[in-house]
Amino acid sequence: MSNDRLLQNVVSILLMTGYNVSERCEIRPRSFDLMTSKGENLLVIKVVSQIDSVNEDIAWDLDKIARHLHAVPLIIGERARDVALERGAIYLRYGINAVSSATLYDYLAEGELPLVYASPGGLYVNIDAERLRTLREEQAMSLGDLAHALGVSRRTISKYEGGMGTTLEMAMRLEEFFNDDIVMPIDLLHYTPAEEEHVPASLASGHNPESDAQPKRPEDHLRSIGINVQELRRAPFHAFAMFENKTILTCYGSPQKTVQRAELVGNISQITGTHSLCVVSDYRKEKKIGKTLVIGEERLKNVEDGEDLLEMVTEEK
């Protein structure tokens, strides 16, 4: 299946299950293809045929977007190392969940949570460690007793009760032995970023958006007036500008690329409940394109503080 058909399939699943879906991101390079929301759930989605094509730089962007928008990053694909993704299984790319479109459908449309995850060596499941310990103790079995019954070491059983995952085969043996459910399903809409953000070695400090390198003045000025600026590498917006619990999706560029970028970023801001701003070089006007405020660099220099900027981006033109 081509990337376009796969993307259309994903959009159909999202719309069918009641999600609001952003316009497709056509700007290159791009770390994601869609933003989608339903209630309190916000997803940032990358669609690729081969999930191995998602490199560390893209994953870093996905994680950073998820952190700042309280979203869930998700990769939808078909294959990993030329092997089809198993339906109902979760794969990982640099800490980001990756699933097939069929698994996405099962989760969103049928309410079926994945049970297995792929790891070197095969498919594994998470065990309800507390439930396993309770079942063993209810039958007055020691760690050694259970280990002997299953033909594994005492240390292995201890690790299971400590939260270590196991193979699908062993999980089935445990459930058959106790005649009870101990496998824990995996919630696709749950994402916990690592405590410390990992920055790939390939990412230099500062934003280096495209080959026609953009000037640093816009983000430098935003920082100078007390706005927290968090830059991205491959998103259609170049940075999050944050002030007083408000987030502005911010992009910089030349007039030639402004209209397409401004319309897309404005659409994304509606899905994510944020605001949007494009700062354009050699530009003298101030107007709205869709939901995005478009101003020139000189106008930005006259913005004195974050409150002034928030008032500008929220004002209807």
From Swiss-Prot:
Residues 132-189 form the HTH cro/C1-type domain. The keyword DNA damage does not apply. Keywords: DNA-binding, Transcription, Transcription regulation. This is Putative HTH-type transcriptional regulatory protein Mlab_0160. Pfam families: HTH_3. Residues 199-219 are annotated as: Disordered. One of its GO terms (molecular function) is DNA-binding transcription factor activity. Gene3D superfamilies: lambda repressor-like DNA-binding domains. It comes from Methanocorpusculum labreanum (strain ATCC 43576 / DSM 4855 / Z). SMART domains: HTH_XRE. Residues 209-219 have a biased composition (Basic and acidic residues). Residues 143-162 bind DNA.
